[in-house]
């Protein structure tokens, strides 16, 4: 979902100021401080992370974000974990869409800011049920550009040979018990967009 980073930035700026201060004091990234506040396992909340419309596979600019299940005992930490869970659920939804098209993804390579968070990487593995790996070269865009350039000048016989430059670093494997817990939550999440679609589209004129 294209709101993944933006969603956590929204949380950081509106609800995570304490974690920002702690991160500054400890020399950490604010996101990692926020991730540390989350309890293991699914959040008690169900979040539709379409705070800026939805990305694939629905691609609906009129879809809106939603947080369901809040009570008087809900904490901002529950919301943070709900956001993280929802982004991972969107990833799983995309993977399942690709599988329906005959593309079976057996492992994931993560790059960018999200690839720097062990907590988030393990979460993605637990939710999707497949291994998630980081790369030895952190600047993946630069690596990809150099691979294409090398292919263009004949340094590689083709793109398949150039891919040999990609080396994995750390791999996060799914926790089966945690995966089963997320399966139950995902089954509820999977119908959330359709349930809220009509309401969200009516809000266009509000």
Spans of model-derived segments:
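Active-site core segments that coordinate phosphate-bearing ligands/cofactors
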Residues: 1-111, 116-206
